[in-house]
């Protein structure tokens, strides 16, 4: 037996004929009669008829009242690429889970890659999204300097992009109003100094995130203005920015060093760009036994920050919730709107709310009422 004949033993003749018919309809890209299909494929009319009826039954073709058959446009399943900030950052994990649930609920596939809080990794992941030809990219990475490189790779592939919290060229912005969430955090700090320390504040520290760029840095700008709105006569020298990089251990060391250098100052306000930074400051304050001398407000309202705020005498007096659970549904809705060609705003802000030990206690009381 020749090799050619042995290979034919594995073929299914009727399936080959069915594929010939489908490929003809795809190539012609217009309605066809049974007679025309029979004539061009040279397949028996009986077989053509049965194959066409099977395709109609399975939804691959439709038959019009005049007897013409045409292929049904079967839209492919959409696939979004998501570059998560880091699996080690609680807020990023919450956003990822919210996005996974929202995408699954509408039948959108997700290609999830971890940016590992690292610019080089984020740029490599952008190349992976292009290689995999995703329909849309949702980018959540921290390095402003990497943003134009990532954005250019995605734009060159003609893939639309949504950027979370940090603006990227060519991308639609999605996230918090950074200045506003900072301002409201500052108001909480100012109110604490007013009520607990008789309007005294020796220092107002901002645990900043400069690598994320000016927009994210406006969280600290807003916090300083929020404090000034309550205590207007504070000298400019008492406002100090410290680069905490949004990381817990780094923030702990920096605040610990600051407290060691200022042992006799008992009215220190700290605004942190993230709760992870805020919790590092809490660690430092607790290690130094300075809980009564320091008040801290964070951003994101992650689970550990909520738990910390319920502790008696905690220096963490508040956090601004960015409502991570709302990110997923809103991102998916925004992404689908972009792909449908709808006009969307260049900046899309999420809702936020201030959470304090008092609001937590009130919510718990209502839950048990």
Label for each model-derived stretch:
Residues 2-73:
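N-terminal helix-turn-helix
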Residues 3-10, 72-87, 131:
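N-terminal helix-turn-helix/winged-helix DNA-binding helices
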Residues 78, 215, 227, 322-369:
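Hinge/cleft segment of the Venus flytrap/periplasmic-binding protein
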Residues 83-97, 112-121, 143, 175-185, ...:
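Hinge/beta->alpha junction and helix N-cap segments in small-molecule ligand-binding domains
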Residues 104-106, 157-159, 227-235, 262-264, ...:
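Short helix-capping segments at alpha-helix termini
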Residues 129-130, 136-155, 223, 243-308:
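Hydrophobic alpha-helical
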Residues 130, 189-194, 259, 331-343:
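Short, hydrophobic alpha-helical segments
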Residues 144-180, 196, 203, 302-311:
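Flexible loop/hinge segments that line or gate small-molecule binding clefts
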């Amino acid at each position: 037996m020749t090799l050619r004949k042995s290979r034919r033993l594995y073929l299914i003749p009727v399936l080959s004929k069915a594929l010939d018919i489908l490929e003809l309809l795809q190539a012609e890209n217009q309605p066809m009669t049974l007679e025309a299909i029979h004539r061009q494929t040279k397949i028996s009319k009986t077989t053509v008829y049965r194959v066409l009826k099977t395709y109609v039954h399975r939804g691959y073709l439709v038959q019009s009242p005049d007897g013409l058959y045409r292929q049904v446009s079967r839209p492919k399943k959409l696939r979004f690429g998501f570059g998560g900030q880091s699996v080690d950052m609680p807020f990023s994990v919450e956003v990822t889970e919210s996005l996974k649930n929202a995408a699954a609920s509408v039948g959108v596939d997700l290609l999830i890659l971890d940016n590992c809080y690292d610019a080089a990794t984020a740029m490599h992941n952008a190349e992976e999204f292009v290689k995999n030809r995703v329909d849309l990219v949702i980018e959540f990475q921290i390095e402003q300097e990497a943003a134009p490189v990532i954005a250019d790779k995605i734009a060159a592939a003609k893939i639309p992009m949504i950027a979370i919290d940090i603006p990227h060229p060519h991308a639609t912005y999605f996230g918090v109003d950074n200045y506003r969430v900072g301002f409201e955090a500052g108001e909480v700090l100012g109110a604490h100094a007013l009520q607990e320390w008789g309007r005294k504040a020796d220092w107002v520290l901002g645990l900043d995130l400069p690598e994320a760029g000016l927009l994210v840095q406006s969280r600290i700008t807003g916090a300083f203005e929020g404090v000034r709105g309550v205590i207007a006569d504070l000298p400019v020298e008492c406002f100090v920015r410290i680069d905490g990089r949004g990381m817990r251990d780094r923030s702990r060391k920096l605040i610990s060093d600051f407290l060691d250098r200022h042992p006799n100052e008992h009215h220190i306000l700290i605004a942190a760009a993230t709760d992870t930074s805020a919790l590092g400051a809490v660690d430092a304050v607790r290690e130094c036994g300075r809980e009564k001398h320091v008040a801290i407000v964070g951003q994101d309202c992650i689970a550990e920050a909520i738990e910390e705020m319920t502790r008696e005498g905690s220096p963490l007096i508040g956090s601004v919730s960015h409502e991570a659970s709302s990110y997923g549904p809103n991102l998916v809705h925004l992404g689908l709107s972009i792909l449908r060609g709808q006009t969307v705003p260049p900046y899309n802000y999420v809702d936020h709310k201030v959470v304090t030990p008092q609001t937590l206690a009130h919510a718990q009381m209502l839950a048990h009422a």
